[in-house]
Amino acid sequence: MNPLILLLITLTVILGTLIVMMSSHWLMIWMGFEMNMLAVIPLLMKQYNPRSMEAATKYFLTQATASMLLMLAIIINLMYSGQWTFTKFMDPTASIIMTLALMMKLGLAPFHFWVPEVTQGISLTSGLILLTWQKLAPLSILYTITPVINPDLLLMASMLSIAIGGWGGLNQTQLRKILAYSSIAHMGWMMSVLAFNPTMTLLNLFMYILMTSTTFMLFMVASTTTTLSLSLTWNKTPLITTSILIMMLSLGGLPPLAGFLPKWMIIQELTKSNNIILATLMAITALLNLFFYIRLTYATSLTMFPTTNNMKIKWQFKTTKQMNYLPPLIIMSTLTLPLAPAMILLN
């Protein structure tokens, strides 16, 4: 792709998200979503092949359907309130339809089916954009309309997302699909606490973007997309492989790594709100995610022979990329659990 066109498309994606986050007019918000969606599709098809074409088509159809639902909710709310801007009161029907549309854009269960398929069909760079940046705009609207959202709908979707994010990743061998199911589960954790403490959702979002971005960048350095290729990188880049495995354990929420911090604080918040049964179910279901991450770590690090047969190693040129920002990202993604007391005081 021409660098100038790539820059223009990237700026349009950023501009679309910023319009959504900074607008108080529903029509401008809808236009921002459309700008963002139409600009991100060429980024998904940057590697021009049938898989990326299929992934981009699935993404377009899903997002277009969500945009239609969003416009329907905006029109119903306009008929109810008579104005285009945010109000303290929203028609209950419009609120439910808008929540469902934003859940579809985020990939929350039961509208999650497109996330693993689209993530698997695109490159690692496009997958990074899809699972991090593309979550900001819908989450900002959900954060804004939190007072008028039905909390039962959010809690049902969050519990279902955490369960599906755990079950779906159990039998996967593709690392991109594993991260996609992890994304579904993390979105569920964010939605569970949104109705009780929206600030906690922002903390979880920050930690999720930090850990997912670092993991994707490590995959790019190691040029690995499957569990088999990951297990064969020990001889080539042992430090990078170790970092990937630690990052995955952090994504799974294993203490004392940083991924445990948002889960700990969300469970604490739900317990304060007398949702003890929900907090218990979420903690138990989160073990599914942790299980397949630990299983992947065990299979990669403890069951391989010290020296792999050279015939099994893929040919690869030495990377010339300068990844000077990776060490601080890895440290922030794994060793920030001691910040928990400060977070509790701020909360």
From Swiss-Prot:
Its EC number is 7.1.1.2. Belongs to the complex I subunit 2 family. The gene is MT-ND2. GO terms for biological process: mitochondrial electron transport, NADH to ubiquinone. Its main location: mitochondrion. One of its GO terms (molecular function) is NADH dehydrogenase (ubiquinone) activity. Keywords: Electron transport, Membrane, Mitochondrion, Mitochondrion inner membrane, NAD, Respiratory chain, Translocase, Transmembrane, Transmembrane helix, Transport, Ubiquinone. The keyword Cytoplasm does not apply. GO terms for cellular component: mitochondrial inner membrane. Pfam families: NADH_dehy_S2_C, Proton_antipo_M. It is a multi-pass membrane protein. This is NADH-ubiquinone oxidoreductase chain 2. It catalyses: a ubiquinone + NADH + 5 H(+)(in) = a ubiquinol + NAD(+) + 4 H(+)(out). It is found in: Mitochondrion inner membrane.
